[in-house]
Curated annotation (Swiss-Prot):
Activator of KIF1B plus-end-directed microtubule motor activity. Required for organization of axonal microtubules, and axonal outgrowth and maintenance during peripheral and central nervous system development. Belongs to the KIF-binding protein family. It comes from Danio rerio (Zebrafish). The keyword Cytoplasm applies. It comes from the Eukaryota. This is KIF-binding protein. The gene is kifbp. Residues 60-70 have a biased composition (Acidic residues).
């Protein structure tokens, strides 16, 4: 929109162009010791334009007399004199003058915020808003209306005034929706107010910029709702933002992909696996738009190529980790549905769920078609193709679980390529723990006890070397996690071997030796975990910390059980093992007596410990009597 095509007006437009160039381009080159040099120059130009506008306005209105001093047309905070006491239509001459002044106030506000002068920036933005609020909303000012409220929303969110930010942003959202319903024509962009006649933006570009402003509104609202702990609403707005960014091609591939992968993790917590899978498939496809990963040779020759290689490898590995979590949680949620009260597969429940699933599949597909789907014509097929490689339904039998496991395992391999032990210790171990968890939950679906035991052996093989090599002084928490998991894994293997042995009339020497090895290994790691809680003087804590209370007491309880399970034909050894077992059971009982608040944490273990404390002495005495009579 051009006021006229005079030389004076062209000079104003050129100043505005220079101000934009200084602010958006030249400012990136400013030295560290003067980081806002270009921003300040841009501000001066904007102030000069304000003076020129007042001068043009006076001339256009034919006001005689001495030319008013342009500085007197502003208050101390830069607010123009209030010459608008009634409502104007947005497309009237007065409305356009107000909008043009408001655009300057908007840019001055943003300029002050970018130079960390937040209060001054807020004042300019409020002046901008007051100017356009005097006018009816039309295509001439609707874009500015949304822009200024977006900025005020960001400003107040940065001050942790989340509700205030919410108010500005929700009004911006409503204004967009109302405008699109009642008018819908491409509105003027802020730049259109300061271009010579004939150089206005194209209709297509106006639409693109207007839609981008609204996309920003949705993005900021997603952050606001997240801060207000309205997580479902935040997810909806995040999903809409991502969808619009693709639709209008307003995205950086890696950033978009990471945001989509992050959103998938929210859907996983809500067991909405169809949406989670869609987000992850889209993330993987869009991440590939960032280009090929430069070779190691290219990375060595060029710093830019090295940085690109690092970023691409890292982001793709992060997306792979999100896929791992998807597969793992899908399997674990299925396990929760299918297990009985002792953690085994409930066959009746399995049949019931299979029947129910057949009836639900058709309804789910209908729901899927009404969901917001990502992708444009050139990416949608790729996204759908990737989705088809892994189910979004809870697996109900081994083969279904195995196919999900294999997908998860392939992403484990991909994630470990970047998050290697050398340089990414914590991340690498977390990935290994997820890999172990995948084997653990797959074993639940396996009916053959020997094969199930082999799956747990794979867990031991991947975790044990790490546990041995890791320095507990620097990685105490991780060491404890690994020790406890290894102890549990050997414990599960022991239970499986016990179940296999029970089917035999008389277990052979090899089976007994293997069984005792599993018991001893489990005890070793439980004891390492317990020892890690001791003081430097070797003293066990009188009172366990909350996060250690249940694990430590469970470890003691299981050590007690393991001692009692050791197989030996030597009566003296049997008595020694039972005495050690009794000692550990006694510890659990005594600790809970001295710390009553601990009882709720280990109700089942405490009940069994109390029972064994009364039974084991009888058994020990019988063995002692037998030994005495045999002498």
């Amino acid at each position: 929109m051009a006021a006229n095509n005079s030389i004076e007006w062209r000079a104003v437009c050129e100043k505005f162009r220079l101000a934009q160039e200084l602010s958006e381009i030249e400012s990136k080159k400013d030295p560290e010791n003067n980081p806002f040099r270009s921003k300040y120059k841009a501000r001066d130009l904007l102030k000069e334009i304000h003076c020129s506008l007042k001068k043009i306005e006076i001339e256009e209105q034919g006001e005689a007399g001495d030319e008013a001093d342009c500085e007197s047309s502003q208050t101390a905070d830069g607010e123009p004199e209030d010459g608008f006491e009634k409502t104007f239509t947005g497309d009237s001459a007065a409305g356009l003058r107000a909008a043009r002044l408001a655009v300057l106030q908007y840019h001055l506000g943003v300029n002050h915020i970018e130079t960390e002068e937040l209060s001054a920036g807020e004042l300019h933005l409020m002046v901008c808003m007051k100017l356009i609020d005097k006018c009816t909303t039309t295509r001439e000012n609707v874009s500015l209306f949304i822009h200024v409220r977006n900025q005020l929303g960001i400003l107040w969110a940065g001050r942790d005034e989340i509700e205030k930010a919410q108010g500005f942003l929700e009004i911006a959202e409503t204004m967009y929706l109302v405008y699109m319903k009642e008018d819908g024509q491409p509105p003027l962009d802020l730049q259109d107010f300061f271009v010579p006649e004939g150089e206005e933006l194209s209709q297509q570009e106006k639409i693109r910029r207007f839609e981008m402003a609204y996309t920003h509104t949705l993005y900021y609202l997603a952050q606001v709702y997240k801060n207000l702990q309205q997580y479902e609403r935040a997810a909806q707005y995040c999903h809409s933002t991502l969808q619009r960014q693709l639709e209008y091609k307003q995205f950086a591939p890696l950033e978009w992909a990471i945001n989509a992968a992050t959103l998938s993790q929210y859907y996983i917590t809500k067991t909405r696996y169809m949406e989670a899978r869609h987000c992850l498939a889209a993330a993987s496809v869009i991440a590939n738009l960032a280009g090929e990963i430069p070779s190691e040779a290219a990375a060595k020759e060029s710093e830019a190529e090295s940085e690109k290689r690092e970023e691409l490898l890292q982001k793709r590995a992060e997306i792979a980790r999100c896929w791992i979590k998807y597969c793992l949680n899908l399997l674990q949620d299925a396990k929760k549905l299918l297990e009985d009260n002792i953690g085994e597969l409930d066959l009746d429940r399995q049949d019931e769920l299979k029947r129910a699933r057949r009836n639900e599949e058709e309804e789910k597909e209908k729901g899927r078609k009404s969901a917001i789907l990502f992708g444009s014509s050139d990416t949608f097929d790729s996204i759908c193709s990737l989705e088809e490689k892994v189910s979004s339904m809870l697996p109900l039998e081994f083969e279904e679980a195995r196919s999900i496991f294999l997908v998860g395992q392939s992403y484990v391999t991909q994630a470990k390529e970047y998050f290697a032990m050398d340089g990414h210790v914590t991340d690498h171990i977390e990935i290994l723990q997820d890999h172990s968890a995948l084997f653990k939950v797959l074993a639940f679906f396996e009916e053959d006890l020997e094969r199930r035991c082999k799956m747990h052996k794979r867990r031991v093989d991947m975790l044990e070397p790490i546990c041995k090599d890791l320095n507990a002084q620097y990685y105490l928490l991780i060491c404890r996690q690994l020790q406890f998991e290894l102890a549990e894994t050997y414990y599960e293997m022991m239970d499986l071997k016990l179940a296999v042995a029970d089917k035999l009339d008389q277990p052979d020497v090899h089976t007994i030796k293997k069984f005792n090895h599993l018991c001893s290994s489990s005890m070793k790691y439980y004891q390492m975990f317990l020892d890690s809680t001791r003081s430097p003087e070797g003293k066990f804590p009188e009172k366990l910390e909350d996060d250690l209370l249940r694990p430590a007491l469970v470890a003691k309880f299981r050590v007690a059980r393991l001692h009692s399970k050791l197989i030996s034909s030597n009566l003296a050894t049997q008595m020694e093992n039972l005495s050690l077992s009794l000692e550990s059971y006694n510890f659990v009982v005594q600790y809970c007596e001295e710390n009553p608040e601990a009882k709720n944490a280990v109700e089942t273990e405490l009940e069994l410990s109390m029972e064994m404390v009364s039974l084991l002495p009888l058994k020990i005495n019988r063995i002692r009597s037998t030994l005495a009579s045999s002498k």
